[in-house]
């Protein structure tokens, strides 16, 4: 049997880029909670002892941006300079302007257009992907890397591994076989974890705790064998982390946010963007379409692309590829997709309830992936039953 290796990485919520994603989405939540028509394009950057929030926001909401920044940093665990950032004492800069009136008139007519008339907030192309290799209909390499990162945070916050600090990265290499276009995981080839830690812990203790409390609870035993390679803090020392170790910026972890390198990506980031930004809403609807195709038995693996022009409601193109795993021709599946999904931005906002903020709704998406999550707030993960007739043998 011919096999190949494929690798996906993740970072946890204390990584400086992910910190920025979470602040941007916390701002979005605050705006949408008070004003569902808020137009938000919120960027965040961070470095030692500094967080800056900047962008274009038009909203009736009363938002305390500095409080959102400090609360988000504190909740992640950035509570002192020792761990990379002190939420209560760092410098917070806010540079927010209104949305460009040129964009406003072209996209939503200064809030006068009906939902079906609202145009895309920008040009672009987005991809959705699904595969039957996991219950989440997501790639196993990505699922495992993401869950390892989430588990790192869990054992840090519950005190199981008190030596952990907020920043950390994970990476998983899976050996696969190709079953006529479908991906079949065989085993985990390599597990890599680099996690920030305090001064007191030894490398041996780090390796032992990571295997016992992070890897074993996350990776099913059937995928591990005596040949699985473990690289656990291979650099030997990771005390300085968070914004103290590296600068952070919103939108720099777009592959981690999506499919771990599988499928494709149009390049647009998600966090800090309201649903008129099709970078986000378009990617959500095509994930729902791809997932529904696989869940309905139309294919074992699928990618869906949609594209837009700024100010134009209807998509320019919709594309489906099932990698040869489709039960009926891809052109027939494309027809089913177009009949069942409304790709107009205003209608996507309604059908996926994307104007509802608050309660950490979008903040939750900003760490540990936007897809494959079992959470009712992730409305794009709800499978739409697709009716089709199996061809006669």
UniProtKB/Swiss-Prot annotation:
Binds 2 divalent ions per subunit. The metal ions interact primarily with the substrate. Can utilize magnesium, manganese or cobalt (in vitro). One of its GO terms (biological process) is one-carbon metabolic process. It is found in: Cytoplasm. InterPro entries: ADOMET_SYNTHASE_CS (IPR022631), S-AdoMet_synt_C (IPR022630), S-AdoMet_synt_central (IPR022629), S-AdoMet_synt_N (IPR022628), S-AdoMet_synthetase (IPR002133), S-AdoMet_synthetase_sfam (IPR022636). It holds the Pfam family S-AdoMet_synt_N. Mostly expressed in stems. The keyword Magnesium applies. K(+) binds at residue 43. Its cofactor is Mn(2+); Mg(2+); Co(2+); K(+). Gene3D superfamilies: 3.30.300.10. Pathway: Amino-acid biosynthesis; S-adenosyl-L-methionine biosynthesis; S-adenosyl-L-methionine from L-methionine: step 1/1. Its EC number is 2.5.1.6. It comes from the Eukaryota. ATP binds at residues 15, 167-169, 235-238, 246, 252-253, 269, 273, 277. One of its GO terms (molecular function) is methionine adenosyltransferase activity. Keywords: ATP-binding, Cobalt, Cytoplasm, Magnesium, Metal-binding, Nucleotide-binding, One-carbon metabolism, Potassium, Transferase. PROSITE patterns: ADOMET_SYNTHASE_1, ADOMET_SYNTHASE_2. PANTHER family: S-ADENOSYLMETHIONINE SYNTHETASE. Belongs to the AdoMet synthase family. Homotetramer. Catalyzes the formation of S-adenosylmethionine from methionine and ATP. The reaction comprises two steps that are both catalyzed by the same enzyme: formation of S-adenosylmethionine (AdoMet) and triphosphate, and subsequent hydrolysis of the triphosphate. This is S-adenosylmethionine synthase 1.
């Amino acid at each position: 049997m011919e096999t190949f290796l494929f690798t996906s990485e993740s970072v946890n919520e204390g990584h400086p880029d992910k910190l920025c994603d979470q602040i941007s989405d916390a701002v979005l939540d605050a705006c949408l909670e008070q004003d569902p028509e808020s137009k938000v394009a919120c960027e965040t950057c961070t470095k030692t002892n500094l967080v800056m929030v900047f962008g274009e926001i038009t909203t009736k909401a009363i938002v305390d941006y500095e409080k959102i920044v400090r609360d988000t940093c504190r909740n992640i665990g950035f509570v002192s300079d020792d761990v990379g950032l002190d939420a209560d004492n760092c410098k917070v800069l806010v540079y927010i302007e209104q949305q460009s009136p040129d964009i406003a008139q072209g996209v939503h007519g200064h809030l006068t257009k009906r939902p079906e008339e609202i145009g895309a907030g920008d040009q672009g192309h987005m991809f959705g992907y699904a595969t039957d290799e996991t219950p989440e209909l997501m790639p196993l390499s990505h699922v495992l890397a993401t869950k390892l990162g989430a588990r790192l945070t869990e054992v840090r916050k519950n005190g199981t591994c008190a030596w952990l600090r907020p920043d950390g990265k994970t990476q998983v290499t899976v050996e696969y076989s190709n079953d006529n276009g479908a991906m079949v995981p065989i085993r985990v080839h390599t597990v890599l974890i680099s996690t920030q830690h305090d001064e007191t812990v030894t490398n041996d203790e780090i390796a032992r705790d990571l295997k016992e409390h992070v890897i074993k609870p996350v990776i099913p035993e059937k995928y591990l064998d005596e040949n699985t390679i473990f690289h656990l803090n291979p650099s030997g020392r990771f005390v300085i982390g968070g914004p103290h170790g590296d600068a952070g910026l919103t939108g720099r972890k777009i592959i981690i946010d999506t499919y771990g390198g599988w499928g494709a990506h149009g390049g647009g980031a998600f966090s800090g963007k309201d649903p008129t930004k099709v970078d986000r809403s378009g990617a959500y609807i095509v994930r729902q379409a791809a997932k529904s195709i696989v869940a309905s038995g139309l294919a074992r693996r699928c990618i869906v692309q949609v594209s837009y022009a700024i100010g134009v409601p209807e998509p320019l193109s919709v594309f489906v590829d099932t990698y040869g795993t489709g039960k009926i021709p891809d052109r027939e599946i494309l027809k089913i997709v177009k009949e069942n999904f409304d790709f107009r931005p205003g209608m996507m906002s309604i059908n996926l309830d994307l104007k509802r903020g608050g309660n950490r709704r979008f903040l939750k998406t900003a760490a540990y992936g936007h897809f494959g999550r079992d959470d009712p707030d992730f409305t794009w993960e709800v499978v739409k039953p697709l009716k089709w007739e199996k061809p006669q043998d």
